[in-house]
Amino acid sequence: MTPSLSNFLWSLAWGTLIVVIPATVGLIFISQKDKIQRS
């Protein structure tokens, strides 16, 4: 694997982590909050 390809894959992986993790945490937080409001 060439260094540029390796860097590209790493940047994709980090980009995914940076987007997916906060989105997941946000969804969990919102769903928990929503549950509390309904009950």
Swiss-Prot record:
Gene3D superfamilies: Single helix bin. The chain crosses the membrane at residues 10-30. The keyword Transmembrane applies. Its main location: membrane. The keyword Thylakoid applies. GO terms for cellular component: photosystem II; plasma membrane-derived thylakoid membrane. It is found in: Cellular thylakoid membrane. Involved in the binding and/or turnover of quinones at the Q(B) site of photosystem II (PSII). PSII is a light-driven water plastoquinone oxidoreductase, using light energy to abstract electrons from H(2)O, generating a proton gradient subsequently used for ATP formation. Belongs to the PsbX family. Type 1 subfamily. This is Photosystem II reaction center protein X. It comes from Nostoc sp. (strain PCC 7120 / SAG 25.82 / UTEX 2576). The lineage of its organism: Bacteria, Bacillati, Cyanobacteriota, Cyanophyceae, Nostocales. The gene is psbX.
